[in-house]
Swiss-Prot record:
Coiled coil region boundaries: none
Protein name (Swiss-Prot/TrEMBL): Probable phosphoglycerate kinase
Enzyme Commission code(s) on record: 2.7.2.3
Needed cofactors: Mg(2+)
One GO location term (cellular component): cytosol
Alphabetized HAMAP family for the sequence: Phosphoglyc_kinase
Pathway(s) it belongs to: Carbohydrate degradation; glycolysis; pyruvate from D-glyceraldehyde 3-phosphate: step 2/5
EC primary class: transferase
InterPro entries the UniProt entry points to: Phosphoglycerate_kinase, Phosphoglycerate_kinase_CS, Phosphoglycerate_kinase_N, Phosphoglycerate_kinase_sf
Keywords, ordered alphabetically: ATP-binding, Cytoplasm, Glycolysis, Kinase, Magnesium, Metal-binding, Nucleotide-binding, Transferase
Keyword Iron-sulfur recorded: no
Gene: pgk-1
GO-annotated molecular function: ADP binding; ATP binding; metal ion binding; phosphoglycerate kinase activity
Length: 417
């Protein structure tokens, strides 16, 4: 899948060039203050590389929140400019817009070594192509206006760099509409592509997928694509109950059941069998009398089933042993979705046990990739982000890659030289 082999910033001659970088500064804000600067800090190596390799200017563009195509002050990137200034230890010029004649003039011939941050891209309808007006009505962008918006962005630099993996699955103007002859990945995006290509193009085997999450229907495309690639697959989380009920007639009580997904369970299991993929389902569960931290809990086997009025919220200790054995065999592991409701400590043991085993496997030389979203949150909770090979920064984007889809923001980049 050489579609992931793209031109990267370290293959470019940046001397004297204005470098336009699409970053992901979509940071959490509370009362106008940044509560977690991780996304800003993560972009610093790409910015520093451009500056230390003689770039005339670095122009940064990002979205923040969902202003839906109109200016809303609570979504301003102004606080990001201050944070960036502190991290780079140099001045950052913040512009009040991201396109238009004034912005173009400010970016045309800036002082050498300038860092410029543009205002929120999504203040303009033309970034996403659609939005919501002040009255709450849905509106679509006019194609001529989109073209003009993209042309204005293109004028702000000589070279385009994309370092926003979290938005790579969106065909937004800043992701696909900048018309420079050289369009490269920054270090964050390059790192994401390199790890996913290790898993999806040429994995060391056995290759294991660990899948969790609530609905089978949401993961059908993911399961189908991975069945063509993996040797073993663990199915945990809420969707395991639908599999067990359909395939083995297990009583699941009030556990999550996905009517839509249930229709395809047998087809997926037959496909796994035909392809020689070993599927591991839970054999026991930790059940609760309600969905709450203070629920009364106990462990039951799949044979016993979940009694009515109870729901399974985690996998049990025997399941964890079976899963651990599969992890110990694997040389490549992709994990997308927790084993249980790890947000409640009482029902976190299954996910924590998987995490411990994945960390051990990494130390023993396996390539281990945690897809974004809830599993990345679990890695943060258990402080294991630096103890696995890679934690993806993009929930939706990583899911679409694993589903076998082409990401528009990646597709728009120049091929590697």
């Amino acid at each position: 899948m050489s579609s992931l082999n793209k031109l990267a910033i370290d293959q470019l001659n940046l001397a004297g060039k204005r470098v336009l970088i699409r970053v992901d500064f979509n940071v959490p804000l509370k009362d106008g203050k940044i509560t977690n600067n991780q996304r800003i800090a993560a972009a610093v190596p790409t910015i520093q590389h451009a500056l230390s390799n003689g770039a005339k200017s670095v122009v940064l563009m990002s979205h923040l929140g969902r202003p839906d195509g109109r200016r809303q002050d609570k979504y301003t990137l102004k606080p990001v400019a201050e944070e960036l200034k502190a991290l780079l230890k140099k001045d950052v010029l913040f512009l009040d817009d991201c396109v238009g004649s004034e912005v173009e003039a400010a970016c045309a011939d800036p002082a050498p070594g300038s860092v410029i941050l543009l205002e929120n891209l999504r203040y303009h309808l033309e970034e996403e192509g659609k939005g919501v007006d002040a009255s709450g009505a849905k509106v679509k962008a006019d194609s001529a206006a989109v073209k003009k918006f993209r042309e204005s962005l293109t004028k702000l630099g000589d070279i385009y760099v994309n370092d926003a993996f979290g938005t790579a699955h969106r065909a937004h103007s800043s992701m696909v509409g900048v018309e420079h002859s050289q369009r490269a990945s920054g270090f964050l995006l390059k790192n994401e592509l390199s790890y996913f290509s290790k898993a999806l193009d040429n994995p060391a085997r056995p290759f294991l997928a660990i899948l969790g999450g609530a609905k089978v229907a949401d993961k059908i495309q993911l399961i189908k694509n991975l069945l063509d690639k993996v040797n073993e697959m663990i199915i945990g989380g809420g969707m395991a109950y639908t599999f067990l009920k359909v395939a083995q007639g297990v009583k699941i009580g009030n556990s999550l059941y996905d009517e839509e997904g249930a229709k395809i369970v047998n087809e997926l299991l037959e496909a796994a069998k035909a392809k020689g993929v070993q599927i591991h389902l839970p054999v026991d569960f930790v059940i609760a009398d309600k969905f709450a931290e203070d629920a009364t809990s106990k462990t039951v086997t799949a044979e016993e089933g979940v009694p009515d009025g109870h729901m399974g919220l985690d996998v049990g200790p025997e399941s964890s042993k079976i899963f651990a054995a599969a992890i110990q065999r694997a040389k490549t592991i992709v994990w997308n979705g927790p084993a249980g409701v790890f947000e409640f400590d009482k029902f976190a043991t299954g996910t924590k046990s998987l995490m411990d085993e994945v960390v051990k496997a990494t130390a023993a030389g396996a390539i281990t990739i945690i897809g974004g979203g809830d599993t990345a949150t679990a890695a943060k909770k258990y402080n294991t982000e630096d103890k696995v090979s890679h934690v993806s920064t993009g929930g939706g984007a990583s899911l679409e890659l694993l589903e076998g889809k082409v990401l528009p923001g990646v597709d728009a980049l120049s091929p590697a030289q």
